[in-house]
Regions:
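Active-site neighborhoods of divalent-metal-dependent phosphate/nucleic-acid chemistry enzymes
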Residues: 82-121
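Short glycine/serine- and small hydrophobic-enriched flexible loop segments
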Residues: 56-59, 116
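Short acidic, glycine/proline-enriched helix-loop-strand junctions
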Residues: 73-86, 99-100, 107, 131-148
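Short, well-structured N-terminal submotif of metal-dependent ribonuclease cores
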Residues: 1-46, 59-71, 145-148
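Short beta-strand scaffold positions
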Residues: 11, 45-46, 84, 106, ...
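Short active-site oxyanion
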Residues: 40-44, 79-81, 119-121
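Amphipathic alpha-helical segments within well-ordered protein domains
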Residues: 17, 52-56, 94
Length: 148
């Protein structure tokens, strides 16, 4: 997944939740991927919708304290995460969404639309639908059984 230092990777909720949750089956691959990206100073674009979805998922799974701590780390000045507003991408994402299977969320379509805009195929996430659509995702744990 290493590219040039300047080429970003786009964050998805699946990767962020795995990164934060040490009991997640994909915690180790997410941690290793984040470390490799940090070593080469590769930015991780954090769509605002992904931040909201991540905080909501973590709040339900692990409690609001964990969710707020994660949000603080993601938004920390100097982190490798760069928060971007997603409104400019919404209409194109909705257009993409209408042709997707029910397994693909609007947030997934926003992530893919932003990846296209940044001219990258790399997604910091584990969802199979990214690979199915021609993007590169983090390789999931061999113990992980994903849903289609």
């Amino acid at each position: 997944m290493e590219k040039t230092v300047d080429q970003p990777i786009i964050a998805d909720t699946s990767g962020l939740v795995s990164l934060v949750t040490d009991t997640d089956q994909n915690h180790d691959p997410a941690t290793k991927a984040a470390a490799r990206l940090a070593e080469v100073s590769r930015p991780i674009i954090l769509p605002s919708d992904v931040l909201v979805e991540t905080v909501n998922v973590l709040g339900k799974k692990s409690g609001h304290g964990t969710a707020l701590k994660a949000a603080g780390e993601l938004l920390r000045p100097g982190s490798q995460f760069i928060l971007i507003e997603t409104r400019p991408y919404l209409l194109r994402a909705l257009e993409n969404f209408k042709d997707q299977s029910p397994a693909v969320s609007l947030t997934d379509c926003i992530v893919m639309t932003i990846a296209d805009d940044y001219d990258t195929k790399d997604i910091f996430g584990f969802d199979k639908q990214f690979a199915d659509a021609g993007y590169t995702r983090i390789a999931p744990s061999t113990e992980w059984h994903e849903e289609a």
